[in-house]
Amino acid sequence: MRIALYSNSPLPVHGYGGTQRVVVWLARGLVELGHQVTVLAPAGSRLREAHVIGLDLEAIRRPDFNVSRYLPEGIDILHAHARLPSPPAHPFVFTLHGNRQDGTAASNTIFLSADHARRHGSTTFVYNGVDPSEYIFRSPKDGYDLFLGRLHSVKGYRWAIHGARRSGKTLVVAGGWRPSWRRSLRYEGSVDGTRKAELLAGADCLWMPALWEEPFGLTLVEAMMSGTPVLGTRRGALPEVVSPDGGLL
């Protein structure tokens, strides 16, 4: 098939950016299966795996943006990973990577988990996947707990700080900004690539005390790929993604 993928963020991502990584991995996997893949993303995006059509960022943000103008001839289907102001003239599906406030979505929307789909009145979902080659599975650990992701209140990072302190562990925080610190915390900032894989492989556990309905939680899979158990809450997709032998909710 001739498949087009659409992202409204530059590719590849540097630092935090789960959705962008999923798009790159999906392009890579589809090419390996023998499909012809074209990626539409902001100008400056580069992918070894697929042909990239660079889009003007200002054009993407306009309410009259029409992605059909940029699609090459012969495309069989468009898979959008960001909302489009108007439906394209080609067959397309849309993966919702967040939550809609009204809890509804179009019939051709793909959700990230059964819980995510149910909360939007659907039963159609596909779990996110990861590229195993980007992770390090390691059994001997380095004696610290890890919090990885956006330092936002809905991510529950304060509970991770409290839990690690109660257990006498050092908590490594890898996120986008630095809150007030205590001596039991170590701040890594935003990480990706090899450093992220090393932190995941070396952690005794990954904290994910989500206080919102996580659509999926890519970090959960990344931790389990690294042999690192998860400590989290029973919110959103966490009970689906974290197996009984993969962590504790």
Show which residues each predicted segment covers.
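N-terminal strand-loop element at the rim of the active site
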Residues: 9-13, 29-62
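Donor nucleotide-sugar binding/catalytic pocket of nucleotide-sugar-dependent glycosyltransferases
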Residues: 94-136
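Conserved donor-binding/catalytic core segment of Leloir-type glycosyltransferases
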Residues: 123-174
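Conserved active-site histidine-acidic residue motif and adjacent donor-binding/catalytic loop
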Residues: 177-179, 185-202, 211-213, 236
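Short acidic/histidine- and often glycine-rich active-site loop of Leloir-type glycosyltransferases
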Residues: 181, 234-249
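Short alpha-helical segment that forms part of, or immediately flanks, the ligand-binding pocket
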Residues: 197, 220-225, 239-240
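A short hydrophobic beta-strand element within the catalytic core of glycosyltransferases
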Residues: 206-207
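Short hydrophobic beta-strand element within catalytic cores of glycosyltransferases
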Residues: 229-232
